[in-house]
């Protein structure tokens, strides 16, 4: 029996999977129930929970983490999360956390989009690990993956014990049915699923493609705004967390876990998406990138790309993040006497980029939606020859709008190491370096 239950926030109101309901705010202390009175009053773990439910806490940080950074939620579910048969190791596929398969290269790298997968490929089977650093054992670094899928996960569920998942759809919508509610996400939106939260994925459009950043380190948070002030960039109110929803199904199901870089499988006799109510501040959320409040120069020069920071995973070093998630959205460029595209750069950090739609303003061609690029530590990069010539001779007395585009970047202080699949992929563009070879010598010591 598939039970589509009503949800509640302060008041009990019915809801439908046709239109999932959300709660607004980033990192808020939420309370939501899919049956009236399912949340215990005044305590977390009563002797007997309402409706015969089990109380279970899921912790995303240490018990003793400072209150401002402590993340946990209490779940009230039909069966505890421990109810399943033992896990067995799966054969290693293309989704993993093994980043020492091949030596990393200082070359600039760029890939075409993944080809369409074989029929019947669900979201988990469609994930391909492209690169990463650090590892889940040390709880630092990230895994970078691409996915291409064409089948729903109906009787299969997944959770990631290694890190939280930042999902960036590029083509096709995703319906993320999680323990804590339903999240619908489309291209130009992102979703984050916390470490350990179980879910399955449906594909409303039949096919889907996109990117994933797997965060092994500290949870993603909003960056401090400093002198920008109290508003700007990604505003907290625009992050949406689902209301409680559950399904009460029994059958022969599979639970897949990612643990210490490898996949494991277990048989489970019921759907683990059976949380009838929950409260806390650790939960899935989504964000519409089109709502990003872009900051830029209105006088001269192109500011550092940190002005486009959406989410960060902080490290122990002040001012240095384990991962920065940055976007390059539609925006007006108004700086006068300025080379307006992103400038030439050699960076101590490493940059993995993807393109959701349109054209990236530093690359006239070759970098296409669904593709990716990697510029590792101190690898020179920047606008291609065509972009440089055009921008160097454009009229900067008039504002110009970069429109119908959305590129993004996962930036890390550690070198991003491609996997064997990525290094040997047919999608790797062997002639990427040629985009800079047409840059001409303009130097003339007799002219200033």
From Swiss-Prot:
One of its GO terms (cellular component) is cytoplasm. This is Homogentisate 1,2-dioxygenase. InterPro entries: HgmA_C, HgmA_N, Homogentis_dOase, Homogentis_dOase_bac, RmlC-like_jellyroll, RmlC_Cupin_sf. It holds the Pfam family HgmA_N. It comes from Ralstonia pickettii (strain 12J). The gene is hmgA. Pathway: Amino-acid degradation; L-phenylalanine degradation; acetoacetate and fumarate from L-phenylalanine: step 4/6. Fe cation binds at residues 345, 351, 381. Keywords: Dioxygenase, Iron, Metal-binding, Oxidoreductase, Phenylalanine catabolism, Tyrosine catabolism. The active site is at residue 302.
